[in-house]
Amino acid sequence: MCKGLAALPHSCLERAKEIKIKLGILLQKPDSVGDLVIPYNEKPEKPAKTQKTSLDEALQWRDSLDKLLQNNYGLASFKSFLKSEFSEENLEFWIACEDYKKIKSPAKMAEKAKQIYEEFIQTEAPKEVNIDHFTKDITMKNLVEPSLSSFDMAQKRIHALMEKDSLPRFVRSEFYQELIK
């Protein structure tokens, strides 16, 4: 073992072991040719049961993530695209925050806040979003007494990340290019 690994926290080493095991499983030779087939769609699924949007609206999405998110077809299209890239956690977090803001009951708000935290914010959460430690700490402090604004800072950071990274990839994708034809 190299000297650098000893300095890593135990949780990092455990995570590295888990990844090594998963990679080992993926690298095993298949027993049959049928095992080689991985059920993966190269193109994202088109959104179902959502009224198609106009060309003008779709063209506006290039410049405005907010316009995309406010349009049901745009949101469904964006979500399908992100799913095809296995990177939908940021959008799912943003949607969960929007749903959270609609809650009126303090008890339900506390329950939903805990659920969002466990699913997206806490370290090694199933759909952990990429936010800095400062934002994570502020969010955790806000959850001591949940309010409608508890996730605002984290949601703004994720919105900025989607605007800077996910939206440009979506706009360059074949899927979006077909939408605007």
From Swiss-Prot:
GO terms for cellular component: cytosol; intracellular membrane-bounded organelle; plasma membrane. InterPro entries: RGS, RGS_RGS5, RGS_sf, RGS_subdom1/3, RGS_subdomain_2. GO terms for molecular function: GTPase activator activity; GTPase activity. SMART domains: RGS (SM00315). Residues 64-180 form the RGS domain. One of its GO terms (biological process) is regulation of G protein-coupled receptor signaling pathway. The lineage of its organism: Eukaryota, Metazoa, Chordata, Craniata, Vertebrata. It comes from Homo sapiens (Human). SUPFAM superfamilies: Regulator of G-protein signaling, RGS. It holds the Pfam family RGS. It comes from the Eukaryota. Disulfide bonds: none annotated. Keywords: Cytoplasm, Membrane, Signal transduction inhibitor. Signal peptide: none annotated. Inhibits signal transduction by increasing the GTPase activity of G protein alpha subunits thereby driving them into their inactive GDP-bound form. Binds to G(i)-alpha and G(o)-alpha, but not to G(s)-alpha. PROSITE patterns: RGS. This is Regulator of G-protein signaling 5.
